[in-house]
Curated annotation (Swiss-Prot):
Highest rank taxon of the organism: Bacteria
InterPro entries for this protein: LexA (IPR006200), LexA-like (IPR039418), LexA/Signal_pep-like_sf (IPR036286), LexA_DNA-bd_dom (IPR006199), LexA_repressor (IPR050077), Peptidase_S24_LexA (IPR006197), Peptidase_S24_S26A/B/C (IPR015927), WH-like_DNA-bd_sf (IPR036388)
Known partners and oligomeric status: Homodimer.
Native species: Xanthobacter autotrophicus (strain ATCC BAA-1158 / Py2)
GO terms assigned for molecular function: DNA binding; serine-type endopeptidase activity
Family as reported in the entry's similarity comment: Belongs to the peptidase S24 family.
Job description of the protein: Represses a number of genes involved in the response to DNA damage (SOS response), including recA and lexA. In the presence of single-stranded DNA, RecA interacts with LexA causing an autocatalytic cleavage which disrupts the DNA-binding part of LexA, leading to derepression of the SOS regulon and eventually DNA repair.
Coiled coil location: none
Gene name for this UniProt entry: lexA
Statement: the UniProt record of this protein carries the keyword DNA repair: yes
Protein name: LexA repressor
EC number: 3.4.21.88
Reaction(s) the record says it catalyses: Hydrolysis of Ala-|-Gly bond in repressor LexA
GO biological process assignments: DNA repair; DNA replication; negative regulation of DNA-templated transcription; proteolysis; SOS response
Active site (UniProt): S158 (for autocatalytic cleavage activity), K196 (for autocatalytic cleavage activity)
Length: 237
């Protein structure tokens, strides 16, 4: 049985992963739970890990995975969904060629959306512009939401502190605008594609890595075109 703070943190991590595909930072978790220090977050995460609700990926910064949600919680904390069943994660089959939802009794659980994989994207030094379609993935619609989508295979380690690792597959919603702080696919000078966090500095655009080994790159607005925004991530073990 979870305490209120443990339950609140687990739900916050779960909702952030659903929305963005990457876990929240310790500062974001501290603010969300109105705690004064990160040590309290460390204790809560350790308790959730010991109880089998989350998993920390070793030697990787900011890498948390929700394994399950509780079937029972402390009195007064349960929502109808959490009280009735546990978490049903997406199951990624071996080749990443197909993705299917875990078993669920909900109507329409077997439906999928076909998403094209448009080659590789650099999470490091920019590489050549996005390639043509290489193959497709079948994605549960609840992972996507509205709009048009495509997927890219990540190469490089510049976004590791955002929980995005070399070899991951990122799900991108097509768009040509984004808010500062969003993780985007940026096309630089119509030649180089890169996955970075968007920062707007006056009339300039900054592409910020999530790895201190990489410098933030700043461009004039006419040199960068936004191709899409990160909405999810898939990883093969």
């Amino acid at each position: 049985m979870l305490t209120r703070k443990q339950y609140d943190l687990l739900r916050f991590i779960h909702e952030r992963l659903k929305e963005t595909g990457v876990p929240p930072s310790f500062d974001e978790m501290k603010e969300a739970l109105d705690l004064r220090s990160k040590s309290g977050i460390h204790r809560l995460i350790t308790a959730l890990e010991e109880r089998g609700f989350i998993r920390r990926l070793p030697n990787r910064a900011r890498a948390l995975e929700v394994v399950r949600l509780p079937d029972s919680v402390a009195p007064g904390l349960a929502t109808p969904r959490s009280a009735s069943r546990g978490f049903s994660p997406s199951v990624i089959e071996g080749s990443l060629g197909k993705v299917r939802p875990a078993a669920d009794d909900d109507e329409g659980a077997g439906q999928v959306v076909t998403v094209p994989v448009m080659g590789r994207i650099a999470a490091g030094s920019p590489i050549s512009a996005i390639q043509t379609r290489s193959h497709t993935l079948n994605i549960p619609p609840e992972m996507l939401g509205s709009g048009e989508h495509f997927a890219l295979e990540v190469r490089g380690d510049s976004m590791i502190e955002a929980g995005i690792l070399d070899g991951d597959t990122v799900l991108i919603r097509k768009c040509d605008t984004a808010d500062t702080g969003d993780i985007i696919v940026a096309l630089v000078d119509d030649e180089e594609a890169t996955l970075k966090r968007l920062r707007k500095k006056g009339a300039s655009i900054a592409l910020e890595a999530a790895n201190p080994a990489y410098e933030t790159r700043i461009f004039g607005p006419d040199r960068v075109r936004i191709q899409g925004r990160l909405i999810g991530l898939m990883r093969r073990y």
